[in-house]
C-alpha cells in the first residue's frame, strides 16, 4: 500500500473516505488501515459495519466491532452511541444518508478520526455526493464543515493482476489548503488538476497510478484501457 496510507492512519482526527463501486476492495483497504493503527497506536477503535467482514483482535488498540441490525438498529443510532463512548477512531462503513454524514462530520470535527465509505468513483464526485445530500440552505455550512474536517479521499478500482489475482488502483486526494479552498468555494471541478500535480503531498490520479502499475508489469495495457481508460 502507498506510504501515504500510513500517514492517513497516523492522523489524530478528521474524515477519511474510501470510495469505489461495490466489490472494489474498500473494506479490505479499511481493514488494512485499522490493522495498521491496531499494531502501532494505543487507541480505542469502534467500528459500525453492515455486515462485519473482517474480525480484528485487540493488539495495541481496544477494538469494538458492532454489526448493524444485530447489535444496533442503524448507522445513525450506532454512531450516536459511539460518540458517547468517546473512541479515538470510528469506522462508519457506508455513509448513505444525511444523518449519518452529519454525524460523521461532527465526529471528525470534534477530534475523532473517522473512516467512511461511499460508492463514488473519484474524490471530486465524492465531495459532490456529500453536498448533494443536503438541502440548498445547508449546503454552504456543509461545504465549510467538510473543508475543515476532510483529511483524505481514496477512490479505488480493482484491476486484474498479470499472473492472476487482483490489484487495487487508487486515486488519492489529501486535503491541502488548496483543496480545502476548492471545497469551501464550490470549485470541485478544479480538484483533478491539483491531485495531478500533488505528488509531494502523496496525491495521485487513478490514471497516474495505472501507469505506474503498467510500468511495474503488474497489469496489462488492455486491462487499464477497459477499466480506467488512458
Region spans (language model):
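Short, flexible helix-loop junctions that flank or precede catalytic/ligand sites
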Residues: 1-230
